[in-house]
Amino acid sequence: MRKLLTNLPAAAVLSAQVYSAVLQGLWEENVCGTPGRTRVCTALLYGQVCPFQDSTDGLRTITSILFNWPPENTSVYYQPPQRSSFRIKLAFRNLSWPGLGLEDHQEIVLGQLVLPEPNEAKPDDPAPRPGQHALTMPALEPAPPLLADLGPALEPESPAALGPPGYLHSAPGPAPAPGEGPPPGTVLEPQSAPESSCPCRGSVKNQPSEELPDMTTFPPRLLAEQLTLMDAELFKKVVLHECLGCIWGQGHLKGNEHMAPTVRATIAHFNRLTNCITTSCLGDHSMRARDRARVVEHWIKVARECLSLNNFSSVHVIVSALCSNPIGQLHKTWAGVSSKSMKELKELCKKDTAVKRDLLIKAGSFKVATQERNPQRVQMRLRRQKKGVVPFLGDFLTELQRLDSAIPDDLDGNTNKRSKEVRVLQEMQLLQVAAMNYRLRPLEKFVTYFTRMEQLSDKESYKLSCQLEPENP
């Protein structure tokens, strides 16, 4: 990065989206609050070239902008700049400024403001200010993905199958509670899988069954680490403004399937993991009740390991899947689960449903950081703690949807509403920084198995559950 800056003398380096926004003047009020920021933004607005490689204030200002401006889909907030007095040269580069809290943060667009040739200036362009040069600006290139994909890409889920904002609901059908069975819980609406005449546990498309691993062959700690890695990568990619009720809440309407793609990708992963757990318990017709009990115990151990990794997302999904109707009504299976595992499951249910926000604050250790006004100091403090945290995104979606529907968009209540929404998004932003502290490696064998595993649909799961352990007449 330092070498690149050296090769760009007198260059203003910033993301292309932020550059366009500053040209529109949309950030003057919110960003230009300090003298250093005022100098930088004023220079950008009037076409001056700032040698940021020699300016600590400039580096800190760009750091703050990068952390607070939405990295994708910025067309929601502004239109492309109409001015033709600027020119920007783009390059893609991993940003790393030691000491400023941006190590391994994201891949960004680097831009260089350059002076055009004299014949490039258009006669109808507005006259530049005294002492300044006229510049031209071509169309910006699209930014690359902010984070590298984890191993093989997850299979795309059908957007139409993702539920509306109230996607947390109870699964259909009766839910008889086993003797020591877990309490009923809310689950994500599972993604419907293609119909299969004979579903097989752990069956993977286009591979012979004898080569397939059993889910229980993966140690609980390894499973927890791989799930945590997937959850962390997805959560870091979530674009915060897509979680707002006014955006995500409209995604289920016809014609809005393209809205909130990062949120939809995260929910699709929730659904896939839920179906994976259900299929591992029900998909093999040769399994007996005691075999299914061992699988249930295995997933309880995985959830416990996820909790030790502060992966509250997978903890919620695993507990919800085990408490769903297809698995929860297996009386013989639950009778074979050890008392120790049942006790652990009850503790997991209690921690999953009670005081989630307090657990997140304690796990992420950012209670003090939220009171810090300097954004760079907050980021550096979280990075030094080296504690990774992955929250359950559904909690934030539910809260933001409630704020959007409960508080009207009138003049009196709008300020209060937006303040509460911003507070939630700020917490999510801090947790995204904490999610960067994981140092885990993907296991190709597990990723391939997880992404290509054939899964049971809702109807198949419930029907098979009733066939394996029918209710007493």
Swiss-Prot record:
SUPFAM superfamilies: Ras GEF (SSF48366). The keyword DNA damage does not apply. Residues 117-215 are annotated as: Disordered. The keyword Cell wall biogenesis/degradation does not apply. It comes from the Eukaryota. One of its GO terms (cellular component) is plasma membrane. Residues 219-471 form the Ras-GEF domain. InterPro entries: Ras-like_GEF (IPR008937), Ras_GEF_dom_sf (IPR023578), RASGEF_cat_dom (IPR001895), RASGEF_cat_dom_sf (IPR036964). Its main location: cytoplasm. It is found in: Cytoplasmic vesicle. Residues 134-157 have a biased composition (Low complexity). Residues 173-185 have a biased composition (Pro residues). One of its GO terms (biological process) is Ras protein signal transduction. SMART domains: RasGEF. GO terms for molecular function: guanyl-nucleotide exchange factor activity. Keywords: Cytoplasmic vesicle, Guanine-nucleotide releasing factor. This is Ral-GDS-related protein. The lineage of its organism: Eukaryota, Metazoa, Chordata, Craniata, Vertebrata.
